[in-house]
Amino acid sequence: MDALRRILQHEDESLPLDEAALLLARIEYPDLPLAPWLAELDFHARQIRRLSLYGFRNAAHNYLFGELAFSGNGDDYYNPRNSCLNSVLESRRGIPITLSIVYIELARRLGITVDGIPAPGHFLVRIEDDGDTYYIDVFNNGKIRDDIEGEVDPRFLVPATKRMILIRMLNNLRLIYLQRQAWHKAAAVLDLLLLADPGDADALRQRAAARAALHHYQAACSDLSRYLTLRPLDPGKDELKAQISNLRRMHAHKH
């Protein structure tokens, strides 16, 4: 996970996106080996190369969305496994961002640049082909979004960096794990988000809740204290101070 942490802290972006996404999947699958899934991506890239007489975009479309039937998992959208690259490769179902990573990484193996586009609410990929620009909705069977430039603020059509993609994935998992009260996994996600942005007050408050649920009372106290430093005018500050006092008592009782 050290390589993942370096990306999030702006220290190093040399790790390929597929490896970074698989490392992130270890929150859900702690013993996940990377090599078999990287090999599967290699295999799919070779299959697309075999079809590339028709150009990468057409070959990738026919192979991924035709032969393999990759598609969006609309029936179980908020399953955390949709954010795990290994699970998406196995089930051929996922959410926009993980399906986009599959597309981006297959293209990279063939020397083709494909950008991830962080459109609001729906991640897309963008490819240049024969002088034309195509926005592809991998969640909807590779549909070409001809309308996107007229509908979306140009600021959201700037390609996402690797770090931005990982943070977006982490934010997806944050919501899911908090809603499911999967406190260990939520805390792991929030640790990474706070590495990326130590001043994320909301993440601090959420991690405090996760830590308290895990009986890590002193650590929860620390997070709430930092939260109040960042948000001194929070309307609920008196209640939060009472929570801190209560957590300190619980920590003292525990020890």
Where does each model-flagged region fall?
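A structural boundary/capping signal
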Residues: 1-255
